[in-house]
From Swiss-Prot:
Gene Ontology cellular component list: cytoplasm
Compartments (UniProt record): Cytoplasm
UniProt keyword list: Aminoacyl-tRNA synthetase, ATP-binding, Cytoplasm, Ligase, Nucleotide-binding, Protein biosynthesis
Provenance organism: Shewanella oneidensis (strain ATCC 700550 / JCM 31522 / CIP 106686 / LMG 19005 / NCIMB 14063 / MR-1)
Main location: cytoplasm
UniProt xrefs under SUPFAM superfamilies: Class II aaRS and biotin synthetases (SSF55681), Nucleic acid-binding proteins (SSF50249)
UniProt protein name: Asparagine--tRNA ligase
UniProt xrefs under InterPro entries: Aa-tRNA-synt_II, aa-tRNA-synth_II, aa-tRNA-synth_II/BPL/LPL, Asn-tRNA-ligase, Asp/Asn-tRNA-synth_IIb, NA-bd_OB-fold, NA-bd_OB_tRNA
Keyword hit for ATP-binding: yes
GO biological process, one term: asparaginyl-tRNA aminoacylation
Entry-linked NCBIfam families: asnS, PRK03932.1
Length: 466
């Protein structure tokens, strides 16, 4: 006898006739008139539960097995047999059922057999992993995460842990969460009435990071190829299906790289990750295709087999203006492309993933390399059919004088970035990188449209339960 996951049984890793023990939770119980009960037991290792055929000859059949309800935790031992029914290859002829946890009141158990709206499940974030949809999201999320780590490891990158607490604003946007140990009811003040952060824990204002990029650049300028993968925070008061206050970012940074180099890196990473999901999590994808978005499998297969198109921002604006389409937001040179513009380019014009490059400098961050025309920067966005922007990146400004000019243009104090400027003073090097919002990637792969449903415990305006 051995402990087995449900997934390992379905994969045929245990011989027919062998005895295994499966530990999990009851999805359903069905009783027959012949004195047999059928337990569907899941353990989260794969989408489908395994069926256990329980005879009434078990000692605890009447007083325990017949009282099992959805959500009860059990340890089931039995012999693996080929299933005569459709839908699964194997089932268990059960020889023992041990109940480890009862559902106290089955009538009030929120995750009982009835269906709940995904909106209602957000209010039950501690229990929603037990549902088919959130369990499948969690497995796909894990698969994508592992694939991204493998991709960078196989390509010689070093994973760098960048700080979550910072004193700098990478985006220059100012929408940051402040970190402080000051007494909010008795704040120390300077002579001009401002909060005296000299008295705070760090001796200065501190924030939760909006990006690991600036810190990542320091390591790329020593280790050549690095990536970060961790949580980031934005105090953006947006209550939409596309925004979270806490989310995860993948941010590679490569020394001696150009914008074209990282565009190629982005394409390689996305295709590698999508291939992993198609190979490893087809059971979950089939559920999403049946119940959430019928195009998910076809979309991923098309993505990995497509060559990425590339277009300059200026040319993209011209394409949009000549499209004959009446957009909600009018198109003109200098605007930041909206989701409707991005999706038109990817879904209708190019009919493929597309990299838009060389954006106007006035709508991009200070650290992006100024192009020779003086009007644009070496920035890129990767647009995917079905969602729009999925990656944003740039070649970084490696020239100190130009970086200082850009900081001044954006009213940022260059002394706050003294250490970042040092990289340009001591052996500066061209380098480039990008950021991938991980939850947006999970949303794209699963077809689950609200980003709050692809992260375990969403943080958003007025939402910080659990």
């Amino acid at each position: 006898m051995s402990i087995a996951s449900v997934a390992s049984v379905f994969k045929g890793e245990h011989a027919v006739g062998s005895t295994v023990t499966v530990r999990g939770w009851v999805r359903t119980r069905r009783d027959s008139k012949a004195g047999i009960s059928f337990l569907a037991v899941y353990d989260g290792s794969c989408f489908n539960p395994i069926q256990g055929v329980v005879p009434n000859s078990l000692e605890n059949y009447d007083n325990e097995v017949l009282k099992l309800t959805a959500g009860c935790s059990v340890i089931v031992t039995g012999d693996i047999v080929e299933s005569p029914g459709a839908g699964q290859a194997y089932e268990l002829q059960v020889t023992a059922v041990e109940v480890t946890g009862w559902v106290e009141d089955p009538d009030t158990y929120p995750m009982a057999a009835k269906r709940h709206s995904i909106e209602h499940l957000r209010e039950l974030a501690h229990l929603r992993p037990r549902t088919n949809i959130i369990g499948a999201v969690a497995r796909v999320r894990n698969c994508l995460s592992q694939a991204i780590h493998r991709f960078y490891h196989e390509n010689g990158f070093v994973w760098v842990s960048t700080p979550l607490i910072t004193a700098s604003d990478c985006e220059g946007a100012g929408e940051m969460f402040r970190v402080s140990t000051l007494d909010m009811e008795n704040l120390p003040r300077t002579s001009d009435g401002k909060v005296d952060y000299d008295k705070d824990f760090f001796g200065k204002e501190a924030f939760l990071t909006v990006s690991g990029q600036l810190n990542g650049e320091t390591y790329a300028c020593a280790l050549s190829k690095i990536y970060t993968f961790g949580p980031t925070f934005r105090a953006e008061n947006s209550n939409t299906s596309r925004h979270l206050a806490e989310f995860w970012m993948v941010e590679p940074e490569v020394a001696f790289a150009t914008l074209n180099d990282i565009a190629g890196l982005a394409e390689g990473m996305l295709k590698y990750a999508f291939n992993a999901v198609l190979t490893e999590r087809m059971d979950d994808l089939q559920f999403f295709a049946q119940h959430v978005d019928k195009t998910v499998i076809e979309r991923l297969q098309s993505f990995v087999s497509s060559d990425f198109a590339q277009v300059d921002y200026t040319d993209a604006v011209e394409i949009l203006q000549k499209s004959g389409r009446e957009f909600e937001f009018p198109v003109s040179w200098g605007i930041d492309l909206s989701s409707e513009h991005e999706r038109y380019l990817a879904e209708e014009h190019f009919k493929a993933p597309v990299v838009v490059k060389n954006y106007p400098k006035d709508i991009k961050a200070f650290y992006m390399r100024l192009n020779e025309d003086g009007k644009t920067v070496a920035a890129m966005d990767v647009l995917a059919p079905g969602i729009g922007e999925i990656i944003g990146g740039s070649q970084r400004e490696e020239r100190l004088d130009v970086l200082d000019m850009r900081l001044e243009e954006m009213d940022l104090n260059k002394e706050d970035y003294w250490w970042y400027r040092d990289l340009r003073r001591y052996g500066t090097v061209p380098h480039a990188g990008f950021g991938l919002g991980f939850e947006r990637l999970v949303s794209y792969v699963t077809g689950v449209s609200n980003i709050r449903d692809v992260i375990p415990f969403p943080r958003a305006p007025r939402t910080a339960n659990f």
